[in-house]
Amino acid sequence: MIGRLAGTLSAALAGILLVGCGAETDSGNISVAPGEAKQGTATTSIEVEAHPLSSASDDPGTLAFESELMRLINDYRVARGLNALIDSPALRAAARAHSRHMALHGFFSHTSPEGLSPGDRLALNDISWDSVGENIAAGYATPQAVFDAWMASPGHRENIESDAWTHAGAGYALDAAPSDDSPHTHYWTQNFLRR
């Protein structure tokens, strides 16, 4: 039994973990870098009012990573005859806030410990939408690495290739002090929507 559990855990560490998301989202996916699969999730209770709906800073490195991820996605889409997604500053801020929230509170999910879904977070940020989707990832150190991982995953790729979206925003957060409860260093969120 322990050997089988260790083998299963090793397989999880060696591959990309994918989980779908429902609720009002059309699609959502999770991606964890190989070697960074979480053993457990800390669910710190905090008030919804404390949810970080905006970034504490516009660090140039963070902005550069987010812009590069959007460039990679739009270059890919245009090369396949799809529309380039409008890079929305409001979606970027919401995506970055979710990445920061995951890093600060040791969870990795589309749904926050407070029970907020991607659509809930966008509504709290006064972002209107007809349809919304989300990709998240953890452990990938560069925009190219997370883009490559998402492209290798059918669910993530489906979000990136969907002609249903008109706007997108990519958000990145760095956890400079990962712990056993929150072992990831790099957190990524990309929100997609149609208005």
Question: Which sequence ranges carry the predicted segments?
Answer:
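Bacterial N-terminal signal peptides that target proteins for export
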Residues: 1-10
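Post-signal peptide N-terminal segment of mature Sec-exported envelope proteins
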Residues: 29-63
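Short, well-ordered surface patches within globular domains
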Residues: 61-119, 166-168, 173, 177
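Conserved beta-strand positions that form and line the central face of beta-propeller blades
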Residues: 84, 135, 191
